[in-house]
Structures are given as structure tokens and as C-alpha cells.
């Protein structure tokens, strides 16, 4: 699998994991375009909430978020933890 496809698969898996951690799946107020996954200078992924997702985090009292991504051959997996 090409590296760009693996990257996209991990991004998608992470957004799905985050939506499940919120308990809603992908539907208002949790939208794909507002679940931004970035990398720090060492390549570690982190979640940057945007728009209504950011407001939801504040309203729910979420203090920390954690994401982990991995891929192997044709599979991608992601975990998301939201701390209150």
C-alpha cells in the first residue's frame, strides 16, 4: 500500500475513534472536518478540535485527549481517549 493511502487510512481511523469516544459517531456536533489530526515535531499524532467540536469538549469538561495510530500492510487502527 502506498504511504499516502496508509496516511489517509490512519487519519480516517482516528476520526472514527474520536467520534466513538464522544459517544455520537459522526453526526452533529461531531463532524469529520472539525476533527483535525496533526503531528508534533517528532511525528506523534495529536487531536486539534475545531468549531463545534471544540465547544463540545468544553461543555463536556474534557481536559485531555490522546490518540494513537498504527498501520500494517492493508490495515489501519486508531485509539482515542478523552479525559474528564
Identify what each model region corresponds to.
Residues 1-84:
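Core catalytic alpha/beta fold that binds nucleotide/phospho-ligands
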Amino acid at each position: 500500500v502506498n504511504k499516502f493511502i496508509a496516511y489517509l487510512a490512519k487519519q480516517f481511523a482516528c476520526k472514527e475513534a474520536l467520534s466513538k469516544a464522544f459517544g455520537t459517531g459522526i453526526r452533529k456536533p461531531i463532524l469529520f472536518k472539525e476533527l483535525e489530526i496533526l503531528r508534533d515535531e517528532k511525528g506523534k499524532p495529536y487531536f486539534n478540535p475545531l468549531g463545534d467540536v471544540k465547544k463540545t469538549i468544553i461543555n463536556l469538561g474534557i481536559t485531555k485527549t490522546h490518540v494513537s495510530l498504527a498501520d500494517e500492510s492493508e490495515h489501519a487502527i486508531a485509539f482515542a481517549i478523552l479525559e474528564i
